[in-house]
């Protein structure tokens, strides 16, 4: 009996170890699709169209990773998440990654059981008000009622700003951005606050968007990016290098339209990027043409930015900090070699 018990415990230990060693990529491959947590409805970043298709900058990142793994950008299951549940689904393993314009902070990095591979959008928190209010900058909101989404860094930044500037205000909390924006439109509060990219997106939903203005004041730094469950460094690396590949492609002028032609390029950096030379897919558990797949299906970072949130979109946001480092931005393409 003792020997049977020991054998059973050993087998159980072996099974647990095997399960622990089964990485995210292996589970994704076995399942046949990537599960990606995303925003419920944020134009430019994650929103579902009338035809049921999801689009946005964060959505493109999920599709890019699916392209790298499966050579098919549609092998993604999207799971819309609220601000209160977005990190829970990562920690529980319900999703393989979260791409939902979430802010990378110290506490989230050190105590939330998650890793943040990259920043795919550098932002800052601001305010949106009715033009008729006559306010031109944030300090003019003394005594104002502010709508904000509860359980977010946005709510904390709001309190910090008014306390630091010794201003009085009334906070009106909501479970989602959508509820807060509707309250602003209905006149239940004087201002709504979130990341400026989100303000630009939410403004588009108003029946009379020209009646509202986003104030120029930024009250915080908001590095936004995807999050994954901590403990699988290989998966962190895969997410990271898919983003870097899209940045490299933009740096070298490789686009969705010319990627096939670029396979003939004599530039050694482009050869490595597209898998013509070297075996840079092996370390990621991918084929060596993984980056070619990403660019062929999704395009480079600049293309994704422009069609979703840039001047080619309804949001018409400037690149700013999200431009390449070679043009004064913070998006720095790491070398593939």
Language-model region placement:
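Extracytoplasmic small-molecule ligand-binding "clamshell" domains
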Residues: 22-99, 286, 301, 324, ...
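Sec/Tat signal peptide C-region and signal peptidase I cleavage site
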Residues: 16-20
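Bilobed "Venus flytrap"/periplasmic-binding protein-like clamshell domains
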Residues: 35-44, 54-69, 103, 123-179
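Acidic, polar ligand-binding/catalytic clefts
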Residues: 63, 67, 71-140, 197-218, ...
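Sec-exported extracytoplasmic/periplasmic mature domains
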Residues: 29-30, 66-74, 91-95, 103, ...
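Bacterial N-terminal signal peptides
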Residues: 6-13
């Amino acid at each position: 009996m003792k020997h049977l018990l020991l054998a059973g415990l050993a087998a159980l230990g072996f099974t647990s170890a095997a399960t622990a060693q089964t990485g995210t990529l292996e589970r994704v491959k076995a399942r046949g699709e990537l599960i990606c947590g995303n925003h419920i409805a944020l134009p430019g970043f994650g929103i579902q169209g009338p035809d049921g298709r999801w689009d946005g900058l964060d959505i493109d990142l999920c599709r890019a990773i699916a392209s790298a793994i499966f050579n098919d950008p549609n092998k993604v299951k999207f799971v819309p998440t609220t601000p209160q549940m977005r990190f829970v689904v990562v920690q529980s393993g319900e999703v393989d990654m979260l791409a939902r314009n979430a802010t990378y902070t110290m506490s989230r990095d050190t105590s939330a059981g998650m890793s943040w591979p990259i920043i795919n959008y550098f932002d800052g928190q601001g305010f949106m008000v009715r033009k008729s209010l006559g306010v031109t900058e944030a300090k003019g909101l003394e005594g104002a009622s502010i709508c904000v989404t509860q359980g977010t860094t946005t709510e904390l930044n709001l309190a910090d700003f008014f306390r630091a500037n010794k201003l009085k205000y009334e906070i009106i909390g909501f479970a989602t951005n959508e509820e807060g924006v509707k309250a602003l439109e209905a006149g239940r509060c004087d201002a709504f606050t979130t990341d400026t990219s989100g303000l630009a997106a939410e403004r588009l939903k108003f029946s009379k968007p020209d009646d509202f203005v986003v104030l120029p004041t930024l009250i915080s730094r908001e590095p936004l990016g995807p999050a994954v469950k901590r403990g699988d460094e290989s998966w962190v690396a895969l997410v990271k290098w898919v983003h870097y590949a899209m940045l490299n492609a933009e740096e070298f002028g490789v686009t969705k339209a010319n990627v096939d032609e670029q396979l003939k390029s004599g530039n050694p950096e482009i050869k490595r990027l597209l898998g013509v030379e070297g075996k840079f897919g092996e370390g990621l558990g991918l084929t060596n043409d993984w980056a070619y797949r990403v660019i062929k299906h999704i395009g480079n970072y600049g293309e994704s930015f422009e069609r979703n949130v840039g001047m080619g979109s309804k949001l018409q946001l400037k690149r700013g900090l999200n431009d390449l480092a070679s043009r004064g931005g913070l998006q720095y393409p790491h070398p593939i070699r």
